[in-house]
Amino acid sequence: SYIPTNKYVEVGKIHHLIKYNQQEGLRVGIPLRTTEALWKHVSLEAMVAYGTGDRAFKGFGQVNIALPSERRHTVQLKYRDLYVYSEVDDFEEYRRENKIFNPQVNLITDVFRGARFNPKYFYNTMTRRQEGRVQFADDWNKYLETKAYIKVGQTGYGEATRNYHSQPTMFYSTLGASARISFNERKVDTYFHRRYIYNNLPVIYVGAELGSYRLDNMPSYRMYGNLQLMLRHRVDLGMGGELNYLLQAGLVFGKVPYPLLHHFAGNQ
């Protein structure tokens, strides 16, 4: 996902270099990251981009810090101002944990999704999100790893059936935690990135969030919460290949607007 340029700085992730969507038009970005040769336990990453359609600058900056310990313990501080799909939440990242291109939006998803679906609906579900975040990721043993995070920000509404420019803005603050439980699974760690070598045993994911939100037409904040569960399993069928499946379930507590609903992957 990165292009080496010199010993201490590399370009990437490469999906940030160029994008196209109906809100921004053609967007060109300059993403950079420090390398392990500069700091083994610290990574600085940032991107500045300009959209020719909305004529606006956007981007993000993040700091990753790894504690010098035998097991993985990392801290991430991040601020982003980017367009994202309103249907993708934090727990959804587990479903795509092994993908090289793991963003919510990139050039390929923009082009193919825009060609396949009604352009009006495609346009409406991408929203500009401005968010600050602090996240802790920890390994406790070879079976259990956890994440805990605090995020505060604002986002567009993103409901597909409503006119984009008439939709309200949502302000939110959220405390979340999740756990990943695996059994005898091999993990490959590189510079602030992990890949999983799945075996024939299931992987279990659980998550919970508690937060508050307010739309710009509401006088005060409301509380909400959610619980999520996912099971991933790869079954070796020998000469018949393999079967990969996911099971997902969850609960949302409180009266919530569209951006706080959970959207399951696949055709609906």
What are these regions (language model features)?
Residues 22-23, 62, 76, 104, ...:
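Residue-identity detector for glutamine
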Residues 41-43, 72-74, 145, 242-244:
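Membrane-spanning beta-strand positions in outer-membrane beta-barrel proteins
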Residues 36-38, 67-71, 140-142, 183-185, ...:
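Outer-membrane beta-barrel strand-turn architecture
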Residues 42-67, 223-235:
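Short secondary-structure subsegments characteristic of cysteine-rich extracellular domains
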Residues 74-122, 192-197, 203-268:
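C-terminal outer-membrane beta-barrel translocator/porin domains of Gram-negative envelope proteins
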